[in-house]
């Protein structure tokens, strides 16, 4: 098996390396090699700005189709990007749920209208998403979800609580798994709803850690 890189792949690595050198400057220098799990001293706001900087360079969702705003990188190029990123001690990434979870879900199962509405703002860094799966009494067991959604007229009305919604305080949208069938149990009767965070009835509270932080 040949593990040598092609000329195109070497050029790709150089493009990534050069871009990182040119953009990890100014306030982003303080994030170099930081921002990973356990680095509580790194401000999330600055990490979000770094995500937007990556978006300007076209480095968010590099595996997404070009037609929707991605780079359509091959699997090898994706690996090379992350390898080069780590070698450059580039800033630790936020849990970008739009890029890693919602975007791929919409590309696989969403309508063309949903894809064109939601995916480009994710890849441009203009809209940040959080995840609405886990619940206080269910943990991450989605078969035990209690949050309910009822269709009233042309609007869905949600009632419930979600936890571990990382970066909810900064998010523009949340994708929520809720029960839309009245007497459903376990995995049946669940729906996947896209919900704006800025609306009446949505409240966000921090989770107090054992350290008090």
Predicted regions and their residues:
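Amphipathic, small/basic residue-rich leader segments at the start of a protein or domain
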Residues: 1-96, 117-124
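Glycine-rich beta->alpha junctions and the first turn(s) of the following alpha-helix
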Residues: 3-5, 11, 201-213
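N-terminal glycine-rich flavin-associated loop
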Residues: 94-113, 139
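A short, Trp-centered hydrophobic/proline-enriched beta-strand micro-motif
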Residues: 125-133
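Glycine-rich phosphate/pyrophosphate-binding beta-alpha loops
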Residues: 138-139, 163-168, 213
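Hydrophobic, small-residue-rich alpha-helical packing segments that form membrane-like cores
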Residues: 140-141, 156
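A structural signal for short hydrophobic beta-strand segments in well-ordered beta-sheet cores
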Residues: 147-150
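A short core secondary-structure module
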Residues: 155, 159-205
């Amino acid at each position: 098996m040949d593990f040598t890189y092609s000329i195109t792949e070497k050029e790709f690595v150089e493009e990534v390396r050069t871009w990182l050198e040119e953009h990890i400057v100014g306030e982003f220098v303080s994030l170099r090699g930081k921002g990973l799990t356990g680095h509580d001293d790194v401000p999330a706001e600055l990490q979000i700005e770094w995500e937007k900087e990556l978006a300007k360079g076209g480095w968010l969702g590099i595996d997404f189709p070009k037609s929707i705003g991605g780079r359509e990188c091959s699997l090898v190029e994706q690996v090379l990007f992350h390898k080069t990123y780590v070698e450059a001690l580039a800033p630790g990434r936020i849990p970008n749920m739009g890029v890693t979870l919602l975007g791929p879900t919409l590309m696989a199962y969403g309508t063309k209208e949903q894809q064109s509405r939601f995916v480009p703002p994710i890849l441009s860094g203009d809209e940040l998403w959080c995840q609405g799966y886990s619940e206080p009494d269910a943990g991450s067991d989605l078969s035990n979800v209690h949050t309910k959604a009822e269709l009233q007229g042309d609007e869905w009305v949600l009632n419930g609580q979600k936890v571990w919604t990382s970066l909810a305080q900064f998010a523009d949208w949340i994708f929520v798994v809720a029960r839309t069938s009245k007497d459903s149990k376990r995995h049946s009767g669940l729906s996947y709803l896209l919900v704006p965070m800025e609306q009446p009835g949505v409240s966000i509270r921090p989770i107090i850690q054992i350290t008090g932080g």
